[in-house]
Each structure stands twice: as C-alpha cells, then as structure tokens.
C-alpha cells in the first residue's frame, strides 16, 4: 500500500502505460474499493499530479475508479474554512472533489458562484477585488 504512486523517475516518460496502470490498479482502485476511502492525500506534488490526472486517462480505458486526490495542505486548508477555489485551487484538479467538499460542510455550488463573480471583477480590472490574505485575518489592504 505504501509503495510508489506510479510517478517514479524515468518510467513516467519511458513507460507511461506502466505508470497509469500502476496508479489506477494499485492505488486508486484499492483505496476506493477495498479501503472505502473518501479522499487520498499526498505530500508530494508528483504523487498528487499522477493520481489526479491519471483518473481521466483511466476512464478512457474503462477504469472508472474516481477518488478526490489532493495535497495534505489543501485538505487542511479546506478543514480550516479556506475557499475551495480562491485558496485551495480545486478547479485545477481532474479528480472529482465536489462530493468531498460538500461532506465537509462547504457548498460547492455557492463557492463556485462566488469564484466566478470574483473572476469577473478581476477581469474588469477591479483591483480591489484581488485576493489579499491580510484581509482574511483582519488586516488592512
């Protein structure tokens, strides 16, 4: 269970099918079907990327094992109430995170609507709408 995620070193380039099948068969499927896990956390960005992105590739090969994959810090930030889009950046993930976010008591749809409104303000050049972390804990802009 605790072996490599499949990213490895040179085989990610030279043996991509090995990497994909290893990730899907030895990690994602086992976590979902045997461990009944709701999420998989990793501290290595290579592991997060490999296990996250290989899920949509796996679907094209009829390996439909879906599992939210995120970095430990992303999960911790969500647990502390951070915005799933502005701060945690879940919109960049290929694995489905919506259900997990809802299980954590955060409305995915409301968060997405706020983020889309925020993007429109930024696109319009309203610089005061850019995220300023100091404002999150009572500082001044």
What are these regions (language model features)?
Residues 1-19:
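Short connector loops at secondary-structure junctions
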Residues 10-11, 51-59, 84:
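Histidine/acidic-residue-rich catalytic or RNA/ligand-binding cores of hydrolases
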Residues 15-24, 84-103:
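A polyampholytic, Gly/Pro-enriched intrinsically disordered region
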Residues 19-35, 50, 55-56:
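A short, acidic, amphipathic alpha-helical segment used as a generic capping/interface helix at domain edges
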Residues 26-39, 95-124, 141:
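Extended, charge-rich low-complexity interaction segments
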Residues 48-53, 77-81:
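Short active-site-adjacent structural elements
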Residues 61-94:
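Short, flexible loop segments at boundaries between secondary-structure elements
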């Amino acid at each position: 269970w605790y072996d490599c995620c499949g990213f490895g070193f040179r085989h990610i380039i030279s043996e991509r099918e090995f990497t994909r099948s290893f990730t899907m068969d030895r990690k994602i499927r086992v976590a979902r079907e045997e461990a009944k896990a709701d999420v998989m956390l990793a501290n290595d960005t290579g592991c997060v990327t490999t296990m996250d992105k290989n899920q949509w590739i796996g679907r094209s090969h009829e390996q439909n094992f879906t599992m939210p994959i995120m970095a430990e810090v992303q999960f911790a930030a969500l647990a502390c109430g951070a915005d799933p889009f502005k701060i945690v950046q879940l919109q960049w993930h290929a694995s489905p995170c919506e259900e997990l976010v809802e299980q954590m008591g955060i409305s995915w749809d409301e968060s997405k609507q706020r983020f889309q409104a925020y993007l429109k303000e930024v696109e319009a050049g309203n610089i005061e709408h850019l995220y300023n972390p100091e404002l999150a804990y009572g500082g001044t802009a």
